Amino acid sequence: PAAVSVDCSEYPKPACTMEYRPVCGSDNITYGNKCNFCNAVVKSNGTLTLSHFGKC
């Protein structure tokens, strides 16, 4: 199966919406939405990756 990914090129953003569309990171943490996840990816210098869509 192809690896799942999200495009984080527009991030980081100073604020994220409260929209709840959970994604599961490679750190086994559930992020509330793509914005929160992508901000964390940038903060991790790209070491954090997407595990799957939905809660961990």
Swiss-Prot record:
Keyword Secreted attributed: yes
CDD domains named among the record's database cross-references: KAZAL_FS
Record: glycosylation sites: N45
Key word tRNA-binding present: no
Keywords for this protein: Disulfide bond, Glycoprotein, Protease inhibitor, Repeat, Secreted, Serine protease inhibitor
InterPro entries for this protein: Bifunctional_prot_inhibitor (IPR051597), Kazal_dom (IPR002350), Kazal_dom_sf (IPR036058), Prot_inh_Kazal-m (IPR001239)
Record-annotated Kazal-like domain positions: 6-56
GO molecular function: serine-type endopeptidase inhibitor activity
Swiss-Prot/TrEMBL site (Reactive bond 3) positions: M18, E19
Cystine crosslinks: C8-C38, C16-C35, C24-C56
Listed GO CC annotations: extracellular region
Compartment(s) of residence: Secreted
SUPFAM superfamilies, A to Z: Kazal-type serine protease inhibitors
Domains as described in the record: Avian ovomucoid consists of three homologous, tandem Kazal family inhibitory domains.
PANTHER family xref list: OVOMUCOID-LIKE-RELATED, SERINE PEPTIDASE INHIBITOR, KAZAL TYPE 2, TANDEM DUPLICATE 1-RELATED
Name listed for the protein in its UniProt record: Ovomucoid
Organism: Pternistis erckelii (Erckel's francolin)
